[in-house]
Regions:
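A composition-driven surface/loop motif
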Residues: 1-220
Length: 220
């Protein structure tokens, strides 16, 4: 479709809009490389994306990306690269779903993410979750927003074999005078199984509302 280029099994979204992904993409990638002001919605409508050479979903450039799991659909994203859990966990492409911009997970369907390489889902900026059923299993951090993680609602399972369940890493003040590094939970049912910390916030954790949060730390 317009706004998408294809090279083999690599599909690149190049401009703002809504794009629907369905079916099997084996050893392929979905890349977003759009303009700085472009907002993009990726609708997952029953899809399986696996890759052993890079992040299966890699947002290289955009203003904001929403990944919407369509209601009554099951979607999976599997990073099959060999494990690399060194200190470079902030590097580009270091997660099964990796975004250099704000990333929002929405929808009423199910999203299962496996990060065999390093992190599960990571945004270099803010990561937010609303409504969606999401299960993330990763060797390092399951859910990471460098600047912020905001969970409003949904059913979330985060499993980390060697790292943290939910993590922020940047505690600086933004140019709009906002404090970075906060994990905010205002709702949802959240189960975290982590080798290190259930929640590791660079600045602080803010929990309010009527969510359910269970944290188990052990070896998984």
């Amino acid at each position: 479709s317009d706004g998408v280029t294809q090279s083999g099994s690599v599909y690149t979204i190049t401009k703002a809009g809504e794009y629907t992904v369905a079916g099997l993409l084996s050893e392929g990638q979905l890349i977003v490389d759009a303009g700085d002001e472009d907002e993009i919605t990726i609708v997952l409508n029953g899809t399986s994306i696996t890759c052993s050479s890079g992040s299966p979903i890699y947002v290289k450039n955009a203003s904001e990306v929403k990944i919407k799991s369509e209601e009554n659909t099951f979607n999976e994203v599997i990073d099959k690269r060999a494990e690399a859990t060194d200190d470079s966990s902030d590097d580009a492409g270091n997660a099964a779903i990796y975004a250099t911009c704000d990333l929002k997970l929405v929808g009423k369907g199910a999203l299962v993410v496996t990060g065999n390489y390093n992190n599960g889902i990571q945004s270099k900026d803010d990561l937010s979750i609303k409504n969606v059923i999401v299960k993330v299993t990763a060797v390092n951090n399951a859910i990471k927003g460098n600047d912020a993680v905001d969970i409003e609602s949904g059913n979330i399972i985060a499993i980390s074999a060697k790292g943290d369940g939910i993590k922020t890493s940047n505690s600086s003040i933004s140019n709009k005078d906002n404090q970075k590094g906060i994990v905010t939970i205002t709702g949802g049912n959240i189960d975290v199984y982590a080798a290190c910390d259930g929640i590791d916030a660079a600045y602080g954790v803010d929990i309010s509302g009527d969510g359910n949060l269970n944290i188990y730390t052990d070896t998984y």
